């Protein structure tokens, strides 16, 4: 009797396209210093110019190449959003794991904290805090980590609640293993895909939020290559030089959409795998 072959499902075209976009952005972020060593260099004699052979996306009013600004801006936007997603994921796991596994007052305390944070408009709070404390990219990242962490906490807690009474957990409990060992060595590996899928979604939200703060002058300093800052610097040139405004806006939208598509796809795969167990 032949064993049925395992069906390998290929990702849809939208996911492949999203992964291609993310790969291009990652390459730009990683190799920006070599690809565009002088992205912020000004040529006041050139000034505003439309797309052409030497400048595929044109130049802004300071004579800076818009495409080079986008490539260099990826090196600021991507690591910043990645730090927010990773930081909030770390806090979410540290709080959500014991909340879901131990329950009781630990769970109640964690959920009250999450409810309090969810009652606050994240971007508005980030704008107020950054404005009061003087702004800065590092501060913006730190504030968003704290504001995004409750989402990860709830996702991790929910995943742990689904795993808490599985046979492998009960077997580990019968061996008198410590709660910490069970959570970290047995439960967490089974919920890691869920946490990772949620991190992709947080990555997208963080990218847009950091760009918004930079657009308002509360993120990277003036003159620094960043998608939000480039959009802000050229917003008054929409009619005279639309590409200088459209290009960074499209970069933000395309990257955030790609992250959302991949995150949703990962969620679907993780959820499907959980139902078939």
Q: Predicted segments — roles?
A:
Residues 124-128, 132, 136, 140-148, ...:
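Non-cytoplasmic
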């Amino acid at each position: 009797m032949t064993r049925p072959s395992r069906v390998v499902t290929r990702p849809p075209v939208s996911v492949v396209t999203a992964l291609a976009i993310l790969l291009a952005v990652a390459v730009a972020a990683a190799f920006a210093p070599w690809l565009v060593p002088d992205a912020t260099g000004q040529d006041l004699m050139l000034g505003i110019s439309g797309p052409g052979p030497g400048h595929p996306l044109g130049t802004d009013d300071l004579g800076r190449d818009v495409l080079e600004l986008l490539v260099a801006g990826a090196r600021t936007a991507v690591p910043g959003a990645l730090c927010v997603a990773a930081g909030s994921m770390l806090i979410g796991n540290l709080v959500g794991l014991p909340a879901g596994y131990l329950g009781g007052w630990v769970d109640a305390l964690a959920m009250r904290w999450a409810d309090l944070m969810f009652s606050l408009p994240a971007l508005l709070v980030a704008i107020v805090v950054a404005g009061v404390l003087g702004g800065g990219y590092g501060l913006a990242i730190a504030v968003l980590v704290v504001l995004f962490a409750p989402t990860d906490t709830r996702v991790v807690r929910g995943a742990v609640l689904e795993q808490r009474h599985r046979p492998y957990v009960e077997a580990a409990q019968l061996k008198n293993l410590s709660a910490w060992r069970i959570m970290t060595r047995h439960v967490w590996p089974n919920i890691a895909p869920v946490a990772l899928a949620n991190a992709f979604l947080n990555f997208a939200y963080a990218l847009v939020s950091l760009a918004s703060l930079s657009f308002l002058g509360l993120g990277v300093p003036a003159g620094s290559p960043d998608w939000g800052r480039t959009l802000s610097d050229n917003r008054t040139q929409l009619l005279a030089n639309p590409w200088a405004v459209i290009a960074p806006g499209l970069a933000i939208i395309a990257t955030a959409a790609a992250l959302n598509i991949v995150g949703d796809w990962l969620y679907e795969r993780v959820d499907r795998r959980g139902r078939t167990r």
